[in-house]
Design a protein with these regions (language model features):
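Extended, non-transmembrane alpha-helical coiled-coils
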Residues: 218, 222-225, 229, 244
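Conserved catalytic cores of very large enzyme subunits
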Residues: 2-206, 237, 241-244, 248, ...
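Extended non-globular scaffold/tether segments
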Residues: 203, 207-219
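A conserved hydrophobic secondary-structure block that centers on an alpha-helix together
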Residues: 230-237
């Protein structure tokens, strides 16, 4: 059996750098907030695109910078690594409300000094009614107020955050440099006829782009100067390194990159600044092994660099990637536990001419991720039927290390799904993962995952059973649709479900479109728009429809609970009549507490078929229920529809991240036997310990979902023990299982936690002994010890599969 030694070790300095990051306590940093406030105050009357550009300029010119003693790649997001900057133009409400509780959280803890509290309180009045959250809330129609007041539709992930779920055009950045963008913008700006009123906004957009390009150039130059100054007092080897850093930072990202080292520094500068400009998460690297490979090959062929040096730079990049952090509101942490940034790196897949895209750099990316063993980046391997078998084998070896990576996405499903929705074939073949399991065309996709409303299927089912009244809040959400206790048939219940889920889908669209309009007006992101095609050609930001493609996925939680609930009702109540409608309803209201209710619960759990066991009876029920949602969602375009991009439509997605825990807390007892306030099933995975027929049966159940319609991702988590994969024959079985799932069953995605239940329980009891234990939460990995106990318990409770 291979083990971590197979991939080699970090160099001493990278190992030291990694340990520093692991040991660093994350603090709240007010620096960015102060500089943003200063810029907004000084530019109150400027058009919003210029205000945003001048804000970024002020931050990049004045924020503190530093170069760590162990690093070869430079650039920092905050005043200290792993500290979280504040973005007041999005919201200050939760920041001020939670100033004294950040350190007291159950999970996602942040520390804060009294001086930082004072600084944040001093700027808060300026933002009182002057940021995205305030203006977005004011825009929300009264029609959706009941859903916002009761928390049925959360907005923490929308009104508090910026552009997300995308990858910019790194390939063009490296070939043209920002200088190439600058030259194009100057030309287009000079050609504008300002007598045409439509060109006034374009003129200001181009001005904003030029300001931001210059600001990025200045930021890099500051590091060039600092490295040169530090070289004066450094020993010989480090002096040479610092002088090389100085040379590179004087060149990129403004100039095109000429070698691998320049390219990786250029990419990092932009990846970093995108997350200084905006606090959107899931800002991803795209197809890293494809756009970086020409630089790698040239340097290797010319003897300019060695594989060991490349791996050290990759290790360095992933450690720097882990320094980026984000503080969320307490409410938001319930759906994004572990302070995830979801910065995805995609490797493998196919070229645009349909050949296997695996190259030597693909293997080195695997090796570096194995060496660093960090939750960032979020590594995805694109699988296809002709994937290099040695590469696939190495990916499984990385997975065995227990970081929950890589995840596997299936070209055989995703590419046709994109083409069906109007994506050009060459672009579809170039897709990458952009966060958890969501996918997009890098550099051409204006995707903003506003589906953070989380359509809670089990809670909606309870509304359909309760005559349109929400069981949790006791508020009426939809028009009367009948009481379950008086329904004459199962079909009557399904008709009520259809009515309710369609109404709530419409309401979610109203919420999301309103917030998107507010985002468009208040927080356009200039650098991000510059680097996504063809915002410059159209002179529009991403939010205005500047991207070539623009799609939004809705997110759903509790799919397995919905399936199991419907099956239990149909079989035990209507088909076999073992439980009366009143008995079931009373047991739900009682939360299965009384002896009679516990008897009902036992029947629901043990005598009804369960999703995840390849039983059509239950699997096809959830497909029918899902179809109502998908059919309704497709009716509603997003705010960029007919404004330039191809698409402008919505589709489904199951990337519920850790929302199954928070959503479960807000959901009463359900007909599958689940008790109130306990977690729902996550993604498209079966409910805990309900999948009794092994992993093949799970794959078959999941493959029956309308995968081609769930283009936003069909997230499937599986769990096996490290001991199981110690045998080579079991590893081969797992490889064949994944191939069958993708090739024959047309599965979308799968990822594995390779960790024992005993290890997780010990880590919960003795966190100091497991500081670098990483687990797969949902479509991302996180350090186990930073998760709340509820999320830890949810992961511990997942089924351990045999092979």
């Amino acid at each position: 059996m291979k083990n971590s030694a197979h991939f080699g070790s970090l160099t001493p300095r990278m190992d030291h750098f990694r340990e520093e990051i692991l040991d660093k306590k994350p603090y709240i940093d007010a620096t960015r907030a102060i500089l943003a406030t200063q810029a907004y105050k000084e530019n109150l009357n400027q058009p919003v695109v210029l205000k945003r550009a001048l804000m970024l300029k002020n931050i990049l010119e004045k924020m503190p910078i530093y170069i760590e003693e162990d690093t070869l790649i430079v650039g920092n997001q905050a005043s200290s690594n792993r500290d979280a900057p504040i973005f007041p133009e999005y919201t200050m409400k939760f920041v001020i409300d939670e100033l004294d509780t950040f350190e007291k959280r159950d999970g996602d803890v942040f520390y804060i000094t009294e001086k930082t509290k004072e600084d944040l309180r001093s700027i808060a009045p300026f933002w009182q009614n002057n940021n995205l959250r305030a203006k977005g809330e004011a825009l929300l129609p009264e029609e959706v107020s009941v859903f916002m007041e009761t928390g049925f539709f959360g907005m923490e992930g929308k009104l508090n955050a910026g552009d997300a779920h995308l990858s910019v055009n790194y390939q063009r950045l490296l070939s043209d440099g920002l200088k190439g963008y600058e030259e194009r913008v100057k030309k287009l700006k000079g050609e504008l006829d300002l007598c045409n009123p439509a060109n006034i906004d374009k003129y200001h957009f181009y001005r904003a782009v030029l300001i931001v390009i210059d600001a990025v150039k200045t930021f890099a130059s500051r590091f060039s100067k600092l490295a040169k100054e530090m070289s004066l007092n450094a020993e010989k080897k480090r002096r040479e390194e610092l002088l090389e850093i100085s040379r590179i930072c004087a060149k990129v990202p403004y100039e095109p990159a000429s070698n691998f080292y320049e390219a990786i520094q250029s990419v990092w500068f932009v990846q970093l600044i995108l997350q200084i400009e905006s606090n959107g998460h899931s800002v991803s690297y795209g197809r890293f092994d494809q756009y970086m490979y020409p630089f790698y090959k040239k340097d290797i062929d010319e003897g300019f660099i060695t594989d060991d040096e490349v791996v050290e730079l990759l290790d360095n990049l992933w450690i720097k990637t882990t320094t980026i952090n984000k503080v969320r509101s307490q409410a938001h942490t319930f759906s994004s536990a572990g302070s995830p940034m979801y910065q995805n790196v995609t490797i493998g897949g196919q070229t645009t001419d349909k050949k296997d895209a695996v190259n030597a750099l693909s293997f080195l990316v695997l090796k570096s991720v194995a060496q660093t063993r960090l939750p960032q980046p979020n590594l995805t391997v694109r699988y296809h039927k002709n994937l290099d078998p040695h590469f696939f084998d190495e990916a499984i070896e990385v997975m065995k290390l227990g970081t929950g990576m890589p995840a596997f996405n299936n070209d055989e499903v995703i590419i046709p799904s994109f083409i069906e929705k109007g994506v050009k074939e060459e672009d579809a073949y170039n897709y990458s993962a952009i966060g958890c399991v969501e996918t997009a065309v890098p550099g051409k996709w204006g995707y903003r995952c506003t589906g953070m409303s989380y359509m809670n299927f089990p809670r909606i089912l309870l509304i359909a059973m309760n005559n349109g009244v929400d069981m949790t809040s006791q508020k009426r959400f939809v028009e009367p649709c009948g009481y379950f206790t008086k329904m004459k048939s199962f079909d009557e219940l399904m008709n009520a479900w259809d009515k309710v889920v369609r109404k709530l889908t419409r309401m979610s669209v109203i919420v999301e479109n309103t917030i998107d309009l507010a985002s468009e007006r208040e927080v356009p992101d200039i650098l991000c728009s510059t680097l996504v095609e063809d915002c410059i050609g159209r002179a529009k930001t991403i939010k205005e429809g500047g991207a070539i493609y623009d799609f939004i996925s809705g997110l759903q939680t509790g799919i397995a609970n919905m399936a199991d609930s419907l099956a239990a009702i149909k079989k035990l109540v209507f088909d076999e009549k073992k439980i009366t409608q009143q008995e079931l309803w009373d047991a739900l209201i009682d939360n299965f507490e009384s002896p009679q209710s516990q008897r009902i619960q036992s029947m629901l759990i043990n005598e009804a078929p369960k999703y995840g066991n390849d039983i059509d009876y239950v699997d096809m029920l959830v497909v029918k229920a899902y179809d109502s949602y998908i059919d309704e969602m497709k009716k509603y375009p997003n705010t960029r529809y007919h404004r330039g991009p191809i698409g402008g439509i919505r589709y489904a997605g199951t990337s519920s991240i850790s929302a199954n825990v928070g959503q479960g807390y807000d959901t009463m007892a359900t007909p599958d036997g689940r008790k109130a306030h306990t977690p729902l099933a996550e993604g498209s995975s079966p409910a805990h310990n309900s999948d009794k027929n092994g992993p093949t049966a799970v794959f078959k159940s999941v493959s029956k979902l309308p995968t081609h319609e769930i283009t936003g991702g069909v997230l499937l988590n599986q769990k096996v023990t490290p001991q199981l994969l110690e045998k080579e024959e079991n590893k081969m079985k797992l490889e064949m299982l994944i191939k069958t799932f993708f090739n024959r069953l047309e599965g979308y995605h799968v990822q594995y936690n390779v960790v024992s239940k005993e290890t997780l329980i010990d880590a919960q009891k003795h966190p100091e002994k497991h500081k670098d234990l990483i687990v797969r939460v949902a479509g991302y990995s996180a350090f186990f010890n930073v998760l709340s106990k509820a999320t830890q318990d949810d992961i511990i409770g997942r089924t351990e599969q045999s092979l």
